A protein has these predicted regions:
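C-terminal regulatory/effector modules of DNA-binding transcriptional regulators
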Residues: 170-335
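Exposed, interaction-prone assembly regions rather than primary DNA-binding/catalytic cores
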Residues: 99-193
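A structural signal for short, well-ordered beta-strand segments and their strand-loop junctions
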Residues: 77, 125, 212-215
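Basic, Lys/Arg-rich alpha-helical nucleic-acid-recognition elements, primarily the DNA-binding modules
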Residues: 1-85
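Hydrophobic, Leu/Ile/Phe/Ala-enriched alpha-helical segments that form helix-helix packing faces
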Residues: 27, 43, 55-59, 112-120, ...
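Short, amphipathic alpha-helical interaction segments positioned at domain boundaries
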Residues: 80-107
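Non-membrane alpha-helical secondary structure
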Residues: 3, 50, 97, 101-104, ...
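A short, terminal or domain-edge coil/loop segment
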Residues: 31-33, 120-132, 265-283
């Protein structure tokens, strides 16, 4: 992780040491929140005068406020707009108050970034848009986006990659740069948020010849299901052309219509839910009715929807996300 010396200097101007400035840069860029164990492990120090001075600087500069979470001593929230402005991060929504689950996710993101400091992160929205649109020549319409209605202007604002999960290149100097996406599973038992995330990124995934995806969680309870879901929503669609997808959807839909539920897997049902929107409309309804009645051969569908098959290579990994802490520091904290 290479941090521009300009950013370090901007933070040192507030009275922070170089190490404190580096830590605050990472927090401001990736999370907005941190807990003591993360700073202690980053700085390689224990509780004492050094840490007390750091906390005092944060308070005297009014750069952070503390909030409490179950089983945490305290959570520090970087809230000073002037600090973000100095780093060119004023568009981040880190200054606002957030719900408990959001804070947990931001702390988990920081754990990952601190533990994987050697990769090259696409840190900001501009970095990500520039990489995909300028470097890879992908149109912006394929990027995951969200429209915000401003409180001070009637013009809506279109923002990209609002989830801000870590995205990085392991070797930015390689001839072919392969990007790694990630998703951090929250405390919820459902994988609906993960499915929604994959669907949001599906258009971008289709534009990439190769990419990696990390599914991160504190526990491994959902690993098998997450892998199955990724295979159904990402791997299979990218490995097949539109005709294959359409015929698979027709077969699943026919089984559902005939109440043959036992023949369908969870992956089939997820694929059906995604494909209903993709293959919606009168044309596809006409094709389905004709195919179901054996009036339309598969060869005709393949000739109609032959597409231009581009090979895609996807790499999926489910990984335990451990707290970033010195030995023993994470014990007793809610993660």
């Amino acid at each position: 992780m290479n941090i521009d010396t300009v950013h370090i200097g901007a933070l040192q101007a507030f009275g922070y040491t170089e190490e404190e400035a580096r830590f605050l840069y990472v927090v401001a860029t990736h999370s907005g929140y941190f807990v003591a164990r993360q700073f202690l492990a980053f700085a390689g120090v224990q509780w004492g005068k050094r840490t007390t001075l750091f906390w005092n600087k944060l308070q005297s500069n009014k750069h952070a406020r503390t909030c409490s979470m179950p089983r945490h001593r305290a959570v520090y929230h970087l809230v000073a707009r002037k600090l973000y402005r100095q780093l060119g991060r004023e568009n981040l929504r880190n200054c606002r108050r957030h719900e408990l689950e959001y804070i947990r996710t931001r702390l988990a993101i920081l754990d990952f970034v601190l533990a994987n400091a050697t990769v090259s992160y696409l840190e900001t929205e501009a970095d990500k848009v520039g990489f995909f649109c300028r470097d890879l020549n992908i149109e912006a319409r394929h990027l995951p986006s969200k429209t915000y209605l401003g409180r001070r202007t009637v013009q809506p604002t279109l923002r990209y990659f609002v989830d801000r999960f870590p995205m990085f290149l392991e070797n930015p100097q390689a001839a072919v740069r392969i990007v790694t996406f990630s998703f951090i599973q929250g405390s919820e038992a459902s994988l609906s948020a993960f499915a929604h995330h994959l669907q949001t990124y599906s258009s971008l995934f289709r534009e990439l010849r190769e990419f990696r995806f990390l599914y991160l969680s504190r526990i491994d309870a959902h690993f098998a299901k997450a892998r199955e879901l990724f295979h159904a929503l990402v791997t299979v669609p990218l490995e097949s052309n539109p005709a294959d997808d359409l015929l698979r959807y027709f077969a699943i839909r026919k089984a559902w219509d005939l109440h043959q539920y036992g023949s369908l897997t969870e992956a089939d049902l997820e694929f059906r839910n995604v494909s209903k929107e993709r293959f919606a409309g009168e044309r596809f309804e006409h094709f389905y009715r004709a195919w179901k009645a054996d009036r339309l051969p598969e060869s005709h569908i393949r000739a109609t929807f032959h597409g231009h098959h581009v090979p895609h290579v996807t790499h999926f990994e489910a990984r335990i996300l451990k707290p970033f802490a010195a030995s023993g520091e994470a014990e007793g904290e809610g993660q």
